[in-house]
Amino acid sequence: LEGVRVLDLTRLLPGPFASLVLADLGAAVDKLEDPFPGDYLRQMPPSVDGQGSAWQALNRDKRSLVIDLKSPEGVETLRRIVPRYDVLIEGFRPGVLDRLGVGHAALRALHPGLIVCAITGYGQDGPLAKRAGHDINYLARAGVLGVTGPADQPPAVSGAQMADVAGLDAQRVQLGNGLAAAV
């Protein structure tokens, strides 16, 4: 993917992992973060040199950009830099970028050739679309979270994203076939 430029607006695991794969394949990836706290994985232990080791692993070979998308200046900066990129990956709940004035249609108006990838917990529409979705949410909905620790203590959060990984295998187990996905 040499010559392909990617702008990553995601946090935690799914988006940073997707952009890491693109970086490993040769794309130039710029990761955009809020001024503070940035990607929450930065603060998650274990850490090395004050940075979460998971964050370091998922964001190696990426250039960091700090832009406050909650400010008009930050949104204007995003509008200005979008034409430099071939791909934009975002992990906001549906409608968030629209409220900021930089939804998918607005981004494509700025750059008609832009590929926009939206990563959400529950899709772009439907009854759960506006909810945040993370591994812990999926474990709770599946009834698994209650067995991750002693009954008299809060659930133990797994170091690995069990629900995310289990979801990869669900179709094969249920239907007896694999899945081909093209990005």
Predicted feature locations:
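N-terminal helix-loop segment corresponding to the beta1-alpha1 unit
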Residues: L1-V183
